[in-house]
A protein has these predicted regions:
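N-terminal intrinsically disordered, cationic/polar leader segments
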Residues: 1-110, 118, 122, 126-137
Length: 137
């Protein structure tokens, strides 16, 4: 089944990015990242080709940067959240059951993680935030 699935669209929406630069006396920090709930919708027809149906994956991932001051206080240095939408096509010859989707959920989650990482890096790149390596992908 997976060999016949094609990614045709990746989009982001509702980007929220807040950056509070590190203050002097602040040590290096860390970050927390989460993908959030992933929703899967399947079965709609592709408008440009009726022989194909689509799988639409949506998620609302976020990553939060944290730093610790010399007195032990923890501060949020950045917060990035956005909506992520991936659209895949598959031929109508595949009987896409809920069980088949569940068996292959890992594939869709992996793609969400890859594009989450890519989008985060692109948004953070022009800022003063450096040397963050998201573990996804």
């Amino acid at each position: 089944m997976l060999s016949e699935i094609r990614l045709i669209e990746v989009s982001t929406s509702n980007i929220h990015f807040k950056h509070t630069p590190l203050k002097s006396g602040t040590n290096r920090g860390n970050f927390e990242a989460e993908i959030g709930e992933i929703t899967v919708e399947a079965g709609k027809k592709l408008k440009s080709d009726e022989a194909l149906s689509i799988i639409e994956i949506t998620a609302s991932p976020k990553v939060v940067g944290l730093s610790t001051t010399s007195d032990g206080a923890i501060h949020e240095t950045f917060n990035l959240q956005f909506g992520l939408r991936l659209v895949f096509t598959y031929p109508d010859s595949i009987d896409l059951t809920p069980e088949l989707l569940d068996e292959n959920r890992w594939f869709f989650e992996y793609n969400v993680k890859i594009f989450f990482k890519t989008q985060c890096e692109q948004i953070i790149k022009p800022t003063t935030i450096k040397n963050i390596e998201l573990p996804f992908g």
